[in-house]
C-alpha cells in the first residue's frame, strides 16, 4: 500500500522542495532530530521511516514523484541495516545524486569504510548532547542544496 503524504505531494509539485527522508528506528533519536532540524530551519519537511525495508519501499514510491534532497540512515535498523540500504540504492540509479549520510552509535571503522564504498557521503557518530546534535544536524543540512 503506497505511503502518500504531504511530503510526497510537495516534492512532486514544487521542484527543489526541501524534503529529507530519515531512516531511524529509535523514537528518542527521531524526536531529537525532528526538534533540532526544525529549530535550525523549519522550511524542511522531514519524514521518518523506522525500518530498512520501509525506507526502500518509500524511496521507490518517491522515485515516481519527487526526490528527497537528503537521505539520512541509522546504521542499525530492523530488516535492513544502513549498508544494506545503500546496497539496494545502488540498483536505483535515480538516487545516485541524492546525498546519503549514515549516522550511528557505532564507531566501527569497518562499518564506515563499507558505507563510504557503497555511496554514503559520510558516516557520522550520533552525538551524546544537544550541542553536538545541533552541529551534526547543521552539517547534514549542508548536503541538502535546493539547487540539486
Model-derived segments and their meaning:
Residues 48-70, 134:
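Acidic, metal-coordinating helix/loop segments flanking the phosphotransfer/catalytic sites
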Residues 101-103:
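Hydrophobic/aromatic residues positioned on beta-strands within the core alpha/beta folds
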Residues 77-79:
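Receiver (REC) domain active-site loop signature in two-component systems and cognate sites
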Residues 126:
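A Lys-centered signature of the CheY-like receiver
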Residues 73-75:
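Active-site residues of response regulator receiver
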Residues 121:
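Short, glycine/charged-rich "phosphate-handling" switch motifs in NTP-dependent
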Residues 1-21, 27-42, 64, 129-148:
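Non-catalytic signal-transmission and effector/linker regions of two-component phosphorelay proteins
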